[in-house]
Amino acid sequence: MSNMQQKTDVILIGAGIMSATLGSLLKELAPEWEIKVFEKLASAGEESSNEWNNAGTGHSALCELNYTSEKSDGSIDISKAVKVNEQFQLSRQFWAYLVKSKLIRNPQDFIMPLPHMSLVQGEKNVQFLKNRFEALSKNPLFQGMEFSDSPETLKKWLPLIMEGRTSNEPMAATKIDSGTDVNFGALTRMLFDYLKTKNVELNYKHSVENIKRTKNGLWEVKVHDMNSGKIEHHTAKFVFIGGGGGSLPLLQKTGIPESKHIGGFPVSGLFMVCKNQKVVEQHHAKVYGKAKVGAPPMSVPHLDTRYIDNKKALLFGPFAGFSPKFLKTGSNLDLIGSVKPNNVLTMLAAGVKEMGLTKYLIQQVMLSHEKRMEELREFIPNAKSEDWDIVVAGQRVQVIKDTDAGGKGTLQFGTEVVSAADGSIAALLGASPGASTAVHVMLEVLEKCFPSRMVEWEGKIKEMIPSYGISLTENPRLFQDLHTSTGRTLGLNEKETVHN
């Protein structure tokens, strides 16, 4: 059963944080535009954006060591860390604007202040962390960071981690109190509640089956209404594909030249969750370690305080798993179905190149509960098996493409916008830092897809996001003012004490 074509201005595919952010920006910039959202699941924020399906870190490179690499002369390259931090500041500013404008309420339901810490062991790693601390401390975005290699200080900062430690190996940590824990699931649901009040049409249990170009230049989206079983056809001038791991297969259906020679490799994440509330209360930070030599960036171990359903939780991970599904709720045929004549060589080249990743995934899949406990005990020496359960988090599809620097079949560890030359359709691919940089990434979509509107929109964008187009690193006074004002609006300025 098929019905007539239904026209609209904008179609957003996927009801996650990315579509929620883009929809919110567009409703502020072009309130008269009609927007329709199609989501396969029964509600918003249930896949990658769901609070149990990601680490909930407000990624601002305060503690993630993979954003600061060591050069051959021992100096530290902080350029990536600065970039990630600048991008997170845009998210903070937009969220603060939404709260201040009363478009969303109760910021404590989606963002909480939480110290971000890095922790290392061994003389060489201690020196690396000290060098990193010194390099970052010169940058205004990282003011307030502390370094210590004193066991007494570390016991105060990290009581749970330091208790029962018998090794005399040198240890060091950095600590910064301006970190955050973000519940992206709650934020996504809030944004869609706001969009509903702006007459955005939210269609849940609607699966997008195909996307094709019409003769008059519009995009026709074929949608299966899973409630009624009917097939619908919707057309729009602009389509955004924000379906997490499901974006790649939909992008391939568009047939745009930019969709060729791109592949995807799914990796699932697993976390250990503490079920002993007494243990949970002894830790109050996100603590990131250093990835083991040869392990991919996604494997950086971290012990995180989380706030989920207004309750404090403690998670450790990630451990990697493998499933051929591109979404947690996807199909076992997703991976094989994404291999096309135009990307098969790219995929094969990646297979040869990434033997290290393949080996790592095989080792991870084979881990028993006790083996995972051994890894946890590197963080919490006294951890008891009976206190910890394993939860399967979300699927992440790492992008594989041909690059000038890496050659054919290069694995990308990041978030990437792919758009048609005329800006009529865009898709978001990739993984970390993901949700934290949603505002930056969606501004990139606007710049790529609506270049002729940017001059007209710039004033409103700067009202919502004052540092848009400005380097905060080069404007420390502006950074300080914005950090203070957004912190006040989002309830982040109250320095929380470490639970001893």
UniProtKB/Swiss-Prot annotation:
GO molecular function: 2-hydroxyglutarate dehydrogenase activity; L-malate dehydrogenase (quinone) activity
Cofactor: FAD
GO BP: any one term: tricarboxylic acid cycle
One Pfam family it belongs to: Mqo
Domain of life according to the entry: Bacteria
Reactions listed under catalytic activity: (S)-malate + a quinone = a quinol + oxaloacetate
InterPro entries in the cross-refs: FAD/NAD-bd_sf, MQO
Keyword Flavoprotein: yes
Pathway assigned in UniProt: Carbohydrate metabolism; tricarboxylic acid cycle; oxaloacetate from (S)-malate (quinone route): step 1/1
Entry EC number(s): 1.1.5.4
Keywords from the UniProt entry: FAD, Flavoprotein, Oxidoreductase, Tricarboxylic acid cycle
EC class: oxidoreductase
Family statement: Belongs to the MQO family.
The name this protein goes by in its record: Probable malate:quinone oxidoreductase
Native organism taxonomy: Bacteria, Bacillati, Bacillota, Bacilli, Bacillales
The gene coding this protein: mqo
